Curated annotation (Swiss-Prot):
Family of this protein: Belongs to the acyl carrier protein (ACP) family.
Disulfide bonds: none
GO CC annotation terms, alphabetical: chloroplast
GO BP term, example: fatty acid biosynthetic process
Chain ranges passing through the membrane: none
Subcellular location: Plastid, Chloroplast
Organism superkingdom: Eukaryota
HAMAP family, alphabetized: Acyl_carrier
MF-aspect GO terms: acyl carrier activity
The protein's name: Acyl carrier protein 1, chloroplastic
Transit peptide, residue positions per record: 1-54
Primary location recorded for the protein, binned into one broad class: plastid
Task performed by this protein: Carrier of the growing fatty acid chain in fatty acid biosynthesis.
Length: 137
């Protein structure tokens, strides 16, 4: 006889640590004279900020940052880095279209509309640009 189930249990202690028992996929328990049951115990740790380095070249990131600053008329002292989101700089959808047009002109590329619409950060733009340049080679 086999029983299929899925469950999730979470226990929290006063020291802000959480023990979580979970089956993310249904578990199969079979009774053939033996008990097959396993639990996955893990302690949740408060999340920490994760910094991810980008795959795009620094030179590309800097060019994209300069174009974004120009298109949005930002002051020279405004910091625009790889992780910077266009929306955080006050860009709306029209501004984003203008940024994409500026990038296409500067790098002599054409971005497909569906890919261009997914760009939200300087890093994403730089990675897409490098991908398109490499495809042209």
């Amino acid at each position: 006889m086999a029983t299929q189930f899925s469950a999730s249990v979470s226990l929290q202690t006063s020291c802000l640590a959480t023990t979580r028992i979970s089956f993310q996929k249904p578990a199969l328990i079979s009774n053939h004279g033996k008990t097959n049951l396993s639990f996955n115990l893990r302690r949740s740790i408060p999340s920490r900020r994760l910094s991810v380095s980008c795959a795009a070249k620094q030179e590309t990131i800097e060019k994209v940052s300069a174009i974004v600053k120009k298109q949005l008329s930002l002051t020279p002292d405004k910091k625009v880095v790889a992780e910077t989101k266009f929306a955080d700089l006050g860009a709306d959808s029209l501004d984003t279209v203008e940024i994409v047009m500026g990038l296409e002109e500067e790098f002599n590329i054409q971005m497909a509309e569906e890919k261009a619409q997914k760009i939200a950060t300087v890093e994403q733009a730089a990675e897409l640009i490098e991908e398109l340049i490499n495809e042209k080679k």
